[in-house]
């Protein structure tokens, strides 16, 4: 399970940043080969990742993460699912905010090197390394959006090292 600890930490941090409003619950689902393992360390890594941006890395550890997240009034649910997925192992972190807003992020390890990847955000398939700085943009799929975004970032000397695009259907949300 150790290769998944960093991925889980990053999924927790991403889920916190993507959530809107006050989060009431976090659901962590494990798919594929992970259902055969004790996933408590992975759940704690998600919680630690969630909290690290709030209380700092020094204020949270694997032991106190479940207690601290409860102190924030957040209910945590874990599920192991035998449902078929596109990956041998997959982890999904879903949040529900007090206003009913729901967000989800899925991650897996790819290849022999066990490279961590975010493979889905809010139902949109992507493939991106969960590095320290990510920009997630939701827009209507139409010509010129990517170019305008690239120009705007370039005007502020922001270098785009990697990009992942996804859409449900032409002209829909991307």
Where are these regions (language model features)?
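A conserved regulatory-domain signal marking ACT and ACT-like small-molecule sensing domains
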Residues: 1-174
């Amino acid at each position: 399970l150790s290769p998944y600890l960093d991925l889980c930490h990053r999924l927790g941090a991403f889920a916190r940043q993507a959530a809107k409003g006050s989060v009431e619950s976090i659901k962590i689902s494990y798919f594929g080969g992970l259902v055969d393992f004790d996933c408590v360390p992975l759940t704690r890594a998600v919680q630690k990742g969630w909290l690290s941006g709030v209380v700092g890395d020094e204020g949270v550890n694997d032991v106190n993460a479940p207690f601290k997240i409860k102190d924030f009034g957040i209910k945590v649910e874990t599920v192991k699912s035998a449902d078929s997925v596109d990956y041998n192992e997959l982890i999904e972190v879903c949040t529900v905010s007090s206003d009913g807003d729901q967000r989800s992020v899925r991650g897996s390890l790819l290849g022999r090197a066990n490279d961590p990847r975010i493979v889905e955000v809010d139902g949109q398939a992507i493939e991106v390394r969960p590095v320290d700085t990510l920009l997630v943009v939701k827009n209507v799929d139409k010509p010129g959006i990517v170019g305008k975004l690239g120009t705007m970032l370039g005007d502020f000397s922001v270098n785009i090292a990697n990009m992942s695009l996804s859409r449900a259907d032409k002209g829909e949300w991307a």
